[in-house]
């Protein structure tokens, strides 16, 4: 099949009629498919069920320090979990704060604290024109937090190495720019891992705002899909080399390692930032869920245990990614109306369709019984200026369901592209 944009009008009409019939046939199946969020499938979560047997009357409730995890206390988490997250993030345990089940919650709280009490400076609410840098396409819930707190969201284009550092270095000359969101490894949604050059330039930033912070969400630190594993330079070490130890606030969690609703989250930072954050936390909580932390600590004694577990998860997840990529290659390659990422890890595939077609594609999919992340969600304010990006989340459905969903998606992409080309 030649590229659609190079075809004669009548050939396009004929192709559209064939695609329309294929689409109507799929609609008649009354499918109910969901690729809207990066939720682990039941098969992935089942691999962690054994942890519920690791804490109880038979196994005891005390950690290695003799702390009874049923009781109050332990503001910044159990030492076992600090050690584990320190291994994952390649930091010192003293730099780790272990929280509840949600790293997003910790991000929200950190910004809320900065709004009222500053981040080593004046409270952020005093800056009326405050701005936050948002690499795009990116994570909608990051953008939503900054928007909730009244920041103007500044899109920063992503490229093959990470965010556009030239643009970032220009924007941080403005002292009203207070931070940047980063998903540096297997980024959401395009699966890019920041290059060494990008990490080094990020660490060397000299913002006009001394309270500028890098919100480094290392959500997919150990989430490899294939034997080819991306490597990410240590942002904290690089910041220390550049005299910027306080610049990054690092987040991660076990949400997509064990249970999204009952994992363990952590944040990490310089000793100065950790002291500041813990000083504020003491007014917020007496401590996190230590029993859940103990369950995780007993299941994962070290990074090697995590890596073995993640290989099992990858074995479950990989066929789902492969099924989507296979359909994209078979149905859309060479048509000139779509491009997509082939990530080595993470939870998403980023699909770019013909400009002006993303909303129509998601509409067509919805009408055929398939739910996708809303078009535009990967951009601030839900507005994709090109209306072209769609985030694909293959993790939750079964391989059979994923294959059906990918077929619907590909037909919808062709339908929307032909419709637009013919009408123009």
Cite the ranges covered by each PLM segment:
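Short amphipathic alpha-helices in soluble, non-transmembrane regions
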Residues: 361-367, 405-410
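Conserved PLP-binding active-site segment of the aspartate aminotransferase-like
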Residues: 350-355, 372-414
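Conserved core of the PLP fold type I
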Residues: 67-210, 221-243, 408-410, 414-423
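Conserved core segment of the aminotransferase class I/II
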Residues: 99, 237-318, 330-331, 418
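Conserved glycine-rich beta-strand-loop-beta hairpin in the small C-terminal domain of fold type I
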Residues: 311-325, 337-352, 366
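N-terminal "arm"/small-domain region of PLP-dependent enzymes with the aminotransferase-like
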Residues: 2-76, 86-87, 367-370
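Short, solvent-exposed loop/turn segments at secondary-structure junctions
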Residues: 38-42, 103-104, 138-140, 161, ...
């Amino acid at each position: 099949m030649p590229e659609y944009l190079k075809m004669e009008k009548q050939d396009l009409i004929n192709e559209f009629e064939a695609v329309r019939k294929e689409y109507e046939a799929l609609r008649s199946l009354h499918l109910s498919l969901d690729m809207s969020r990066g939720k682990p499938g039941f098969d992935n979560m089942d691999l962690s069920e054994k942890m519920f047997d690791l804490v109880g009357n038979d196994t005891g409730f005390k950690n290695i320090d003799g702390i009874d995890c049923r009781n109050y206390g332990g503001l910044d988490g159990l030492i076992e979990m600090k050690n584990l997250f320190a291994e994952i993030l390649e930091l010192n345990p003293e730099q780790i704060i272990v929280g509840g089940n949600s790293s997003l919650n910790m991000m929200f709280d950190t910004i809320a604290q900065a709004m009222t009490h500053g981040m080593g400076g004046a409270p952020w609410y005093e800056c009326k024109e405050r701005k936050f840098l948002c690499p795009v396409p990116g994570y909608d819930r990051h953008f939503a937090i900054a928007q909730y707190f009244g920041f103007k969201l500044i899109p920063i284009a992503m490229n093959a190495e990470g965010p556009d550092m030239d643009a970032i270095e220009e924007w941080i000359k403005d002292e009203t720019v207070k931070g940047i969101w980063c998903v540096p490894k297997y980024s959401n949604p395009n699966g890019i891992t920041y290059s060494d050059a990008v990490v080094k330039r990020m660490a060397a930033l000299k913002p006009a705002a001394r309270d500028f912070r890098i919100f480094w969400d290392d959500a997919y630190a150990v989430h490899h899909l294939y034997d080819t594993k991306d490597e990410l330079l240590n942002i904290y070490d690089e910041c220390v080399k550049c005299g910027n130890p306080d610049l990054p606030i690092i987040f991660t969690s076990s949400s997509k390692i064990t249970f999204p609703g009952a994992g363990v989250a952590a944040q990490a930072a310089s000793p100065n930032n950790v002291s500041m954050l813990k000083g504020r936390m003491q007014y917020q909580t007496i401590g996190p869920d230590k029993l859940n932390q103990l369950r995780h600590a007993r299941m994962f004694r070290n990074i090697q245990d995590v890596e073995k577990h993640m290989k099992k998860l990858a074995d479950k997840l990989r066929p789902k990614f492969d099924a989507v990529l296979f359909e994209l290659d078979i149905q859309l390659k060479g048509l000139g109306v779509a491009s997509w990422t082939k990530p080595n890890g993470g939870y998403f595939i980023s699909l770019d369709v013909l400009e002006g077609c993303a909303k129509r594609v998601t509409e067509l999919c919805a009408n055929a019984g398939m739910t996708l992340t809303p078009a535009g969600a990967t951009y601030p304010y839900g507005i994709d200026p090109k209306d072209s990006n769609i985030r694909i989340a293959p993790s939750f459905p079964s391989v059979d369901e994923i294959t059906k969903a990918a077929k619907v998606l590909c037909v919808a992409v062709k339908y929307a592209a032909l419709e637009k080309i013919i009408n123009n």
